[in-house]
Amino acid sequence: PRPGRPRPVAPVMSYKIKSLEVDARVRDQVAQVQVSQTFVNTGSRVLEACFVFPLPYDGAIDRLTLLVDGKEYEAKLLPAAKARSIYEGYIRRNQDPALLEWMGTGMFKTSVFPVPPGAARKVTLRFTQLLKKYGQLTDFLYPLASAKFTSRPIETIRFRVAIESRAKIKSIYSSTHSVDIHRADEHHAVVQCEAQNQVPGEDFRLFFDADQQKLGASVLTYRPHESEDGYFLLLASPEVKAAREDRQDKTVILVVDRSGS
């Protein structure tokens, strides 16, 4: 018998994220954020790409701008109900299950654009966001966890957050990542974080405390479940002073009520 005709092999469709760079400027409670993501079509056919950006939850987003290789593209901000419908459509097609983590928060979506085999595209998103605040503590969040479902590790992940505050900056702390902090003076600081060849496992989160008092202190509490023990985080920092100025004495007292009342 004649050998059967070989079946055609479907072209491989794949991509990798080469770099993800986040550059933010925070003035008091308002953040101007620029996100640049470079991805490469590593497959053998044209890739129809659609850039989807889950919005930071509880963040007021304004002034959205999208550029692809420096060219501005039409894009739209979807409300929560429409975003939920699109999310569920992705799940039915087994695409990007990470989007389930952001159901109900809304998302940013571009038009589809082609990427030739072997070509790279740089997508840049700029937006202004009103940050959440807990007393004197300001919370900056970037939704990085949705990238953990990418098929390959991201070659370079880089964060730079420049903080400017009218009040004196006290504590600066990231609960999720190891960061480098450079303080130019008591009103300005730059926070940086970089990783190579990693698949993100959680969002990037940064807290900073700004106060006019000589000693800044903030407390955060967390309880995973009603039946589990809770935790608290105390951030305390004196103001940044010149060498010739007197240092403020510090006495730290912790009071724990175990009565259950």
Regions found by a protein language model. Name each.
Residues R258-S261:
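Short acidic, Gly/Ser-rich segments with clustered Asp/Glu that frequently serve as metal-coordination loops
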Residues A243-D249:
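Flexible hinge/switch segments at interdomain interfaces of large molecular machines
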Residues P1-A236, A242:
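Subset of Sec-pathway N-terminal targeting signals
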